[in-house]
Structure formats: C-alpha cells, structure tokens
Amino acid sequence: MRPFQSLLLLVCSALLGSCANSRFTTTPPAWAFWKPNRFDRHGRETGRWRTYYDDQKKQPYTAGRYRHGRPVQTFRYYDPTGKPDRSETYRQDGYCEVSYWHPGGQLARRGPAQWVTGPGKAPRFYWYGTWTSYEPNGQISAVQIYADGTLTRAETYKDGQLTEVEVFEHNWRSRVETYSNGQLLKVETFEKGLRVGTTSTL
C-alpha cells in the first residue's frame, strides 16, 4: 500500500470514529437543556419540572425547578380543578416558606419548613417555627408552633379572639387553657393524654 493511501485510510478511520462517538456523547444538545423533567448525570432532578394529574398533561399538579436534586425558587401545587393548592418558596440550605390557599385564592395557612437531603442522608421534609391559619376573610383561625416537625403548642381563635391553647410534650397533650372574651376560664392538665387535673380561674 502506498504511503498516501495509508494516510488517507487513517484519516477516514479517524473521521468515522469521530462520527460514531458523537452519537454516544454524554453532553446533550443545547436544545435539551430547555426540556422539562430532566436528570443530571448522577440521576438527580434538574431544571424545570412539571407533573400532571392526567396522561394528556392537561391538568397540572406541580410546577417548579430543581438543582442537584433539590427544589429551588418557588414550587407550586394545584388541585384537580387547576386552582392553586399550595406553594413552597425555597431559600438556601433547604429552608422554605409554605403557603396554602383557600379555593377562592385567599391565604389559608403559612409557615416555615425545611427540606433536608444530601449524601448519606434520607430525604426529609418537616415543619418548624410558627404556622398561622386564616379564615377566607383574613382573620386568624389558628396558630401552631412546631419544633423539628413536632407540634408543641396550638392556639385556636374564633372571630379573631383566642378561645383555646393546647401545649404538647413528646407528642402528648399536657395542658389545655380555655378562654372567653380574652379571659382565661379553665386550665386542664394531662399526663400521656389522660386528664389529671382541672382548675377553674373564675
């Protein structure tokens, strides 16, 4: 075989190999980055994500974004009729503010939560801090306080007035205070959910 024929064969082989390898490249084309519901090379959700109640993708269920398998910015959830059900606005380190909505679009409940995930960690989503519930007219109906996902205190309101306070210890109700027109009427104490004492304040 002549030298120039050997060189030509070598060049052709290189070109064919390059074309073959380009079909199996790990880098997707630029347009693929705009497609929703993608995974990165580690199998983690990334970019825009959309899920639906139906196979025809006419009834949205969730809409949001992921980065390295963690939700970022604002995730929105919808009920089967298409109305907003709740939203989760994420900040750094998995902290987020969660809002629930009445069917009419008014704020129903809001409070902080945290999404914990990472290497060697089981994914966990829990509430903490103060959660406030509202009537459709905007009046407060309840205030609950959570510590690491566990309810520690619950306040109930009627027409904007405090009516009851419940205190919890180790997932057991330990104390109940009853109010009327802002005045404390009665205090009940509990041990492991069983009432052990009642005190009237009148």
List the predicted regions and their residue ranges.
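Bacterial N-terminal signal peptides that target proteins for export
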Residues: 1-8
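Bacterial N-terminal signal peptides
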Residues: 8-15
